[in-house]
């Protein structure tokens, strides 16, 4: 499986450009980003994400009533038929923890839908070096 791609295209679900940057020294947390495309004629509802070797959870950046920017854990999200969702900085993203000892260039993960479908994909792990 290529980094940033998935093998669920036969189900009409495609994940593109899945990537995360390794945390700076002294931290073990990082955010991951991707594009999830739903080419099905029905909505899909994602309830969680699981990754090998590290913890991962779904989050969204929100602005509260006082104008404060906060990170909120998502219990689930949906992608409409023939639609897509972008996980981007300042929006929906995946938070990873336990990366301090992680030394690999890819990270195997899977979205889990409320209907029990597993959508496997690979994150490309990038360094912060230029």
Predicted feature residues:
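C-terminal motif of bacterial Sec signal peptides marking the signal peptidase cleavage site
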Residues: 2-4
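Bacterial signal peptide processing site
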Residues: 6-8
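Compact, glycine-rich, soluble single-domain proteins
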Residues: 10-130
